[in-house]
Amino acid sequence: MYHFIINPSAGNGRAQKSWTKIQKKLCQLNLKHSYYLTTSSTDLKQHLRQQAKLTPKTIFVILGGDGTLYHALNAIAFPTKLDVILGYIPCGSGNDFAKAAQISTDPNKALAQLLAQKAPRTLDLGYFKTSDRAGVFSNNLGLGFDAQIVEITNNSPLKNQLNKLHLGKFAYATCFFKALRRQKTFALTVTLPNFPPKNFSHAFLCTITDQPYFGGGVSLFPKARLDDGKLTLVVIEKKNLLDFLSVFLLMLLPGAYHLLARSLSFYTTTKLKLTTTTPQIVQVNGETFTFPPGELLLEIKQQKFIF
């Protein structure tokens, strides 16, 4: 039994249109299913947990973007972990998780991929905890510059306009220079198991990733995998503007040459601690919040998927 949960506003209505196509295909296949259209992230969480308890052997298929997937994963993880198999049909603007997991962005092809699988896969999730919140993520968590881009993009009418033209992944690029002006460098301490703390006095971008991509397909760390049991931390310092821009430009080019830059540091680990002395915007799978000065703990969790 498949239960589809659709965020009709994802991708500026793309999820709703995709569901129309998928439902038609399901009827043609005479495949037993049910569905639910969410009205908010809170509604999604409440419905998923309630339905999972009523129908424990159901496969839940999410139609939405990376943000919708984030809320579904946290509904499963909190307050107590549910034993749920999760499917996913990408209908957002960036779709970084879909790219990493090699899920087609064509709804009928994504459905065919899902139905062809006979057994679930166990994939890694990142888990984070601060003094006042905790959560899991399938893509990445960022402090500083990338979070600033996401914050500006999410509050920009241009994102919806680009989504209408199927150019949603370019929404982040359009807010790049505004974020560059707004974000300031900050002091950051990174603590890894069995290593002394590492201090950065001019941190500008700090991203913990579970897979290669962020920002709508930019390859941050090409070697990252969804099933390697590890998180990768990337820190870029901005000691001058030209140096930072050159590193970011290299990130957009093939070859991963940005990883050779002196201002970039990366670490692969199963858990870590970040400490800041100033408030920072944080983005998690494209959702943002303000992180007060303090400690941010991260480690690996896992979730069963089928796609």
Language model features: what each stretch is:
Residues 192-195, 200, 219-221, 225-307:
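ATP/nucleoside-binding phosphotransfer catalytic cores, i.e., glycine-rich phosphate-binding loops
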Residues 65-68, 91-94, 143, 211-212:
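Short glycine-rich anion-binding loops that position phosphate/pyrophosphate groups of nucleotides
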Residues 1-63, 70, 74, 108-111, ...:
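ATP/NTP phosphate-donor binding region
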Residues 78-202:
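Catalytic core of DAGKc-family lipid kinases
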Residues 146, 205-221, 288:
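Glycine-rich phosphate/pyrophosphate-binding beta-alpha loops
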